[in-house]
């Protein structure tokens, strides 16, 4: 009797398997007719590239070892970010997101002439044009992470001068001092500056998280960082892309690009810690002096430039050569400045990576959710 049951079970199993495809079995892509192999999604670059473009990968019928099997064609595009991957800290959720973002910006796609990587990047202004002067950004495409927060109501939004910086598809980072007790209702992304700020997209704000150690009631600027959650996920375009976050690798002494709320940009340099401390001696906002682990001091290369328009939240980024794809690498943003010689104290992003990651890319059951 036991023998008959075993035979019946085997027949049933073979019948079930015949209705699907096992890992390693052949498959055919329905849309292109290309031959593939049933492979776990996590091991299939072509399926990942399809998902980055918003396309559902073609599934094989069976689930093997709890891994979703997809019809996987051979990798046909050159790999991205090989050098960057070696520089990024292992296990950093911010760094992992940066790599994922680059795949979305340059998806592997099939064309009539073969396979190539797409590109939604804007043609960035050569940095040689902004070495010693402040020059305007024609559109937000030159700083696609850049936006502003607003108050009021739809159709009559008042946009503040204080910038915000997009860091994922649903969160922006900004100065805690800037939002203070203001009821921030909207965030604008993309758009143009002239004749007035006009965003491409407007988002509601559903949550605000101010760093627990920020003490704005006493006008002390330490831990000047906040996060705002948007009411829906952002669709990335040429003019709307998150910035990658600087995670703590060594910084150069010059070449930072500072953008301000009027759509102007300039090249900044980093003074010595001693010089920075001397500039902010006895400053009421820094009773313990400039704290190098959480702040970055910067000066414009052209120290005669006007700096009154640099509002809290103005991003401090690294130059094109150190960017991932066409994203900016956000090192910090303006927290405070003194008018002469336009010395700026910037919140240092790398100090707050653990706090940011736990909010923007939380982990549940060992998986980023």
Where on the chain are the PLM-derived regions?
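Chymotrypsin/trypsin-fold serine protease catalytic domain
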Residues: 225, 230-231, 236-303
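Classical protein tyrosine phosphatase
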Residues: 2-6, 156-190, 246-259, 324
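Cleavable N-terminal signal peptides of Sec/SRP-targeted secreted and luminal proteins
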Residues: 3-20, 187
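N-terminal activation segment of mature serine protease catalytic domains
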Residues: 106, 110-156
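Short, solvent-exposed loop/turn segments that connect beta-strands within catalytic domains
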Residues: 155-158, 195-198, 217-220, 285, ...
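C-terminal subregion of chymotrypsin/trypsin-like serine protease catalytic domains
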Residues: 2-4, 21, 32, 41, ...
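Conserved H-D interstitial segment of serine endopeptidase catalytic domains
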Residues: 147-152, 172-175, 179-215, 272-281, ...
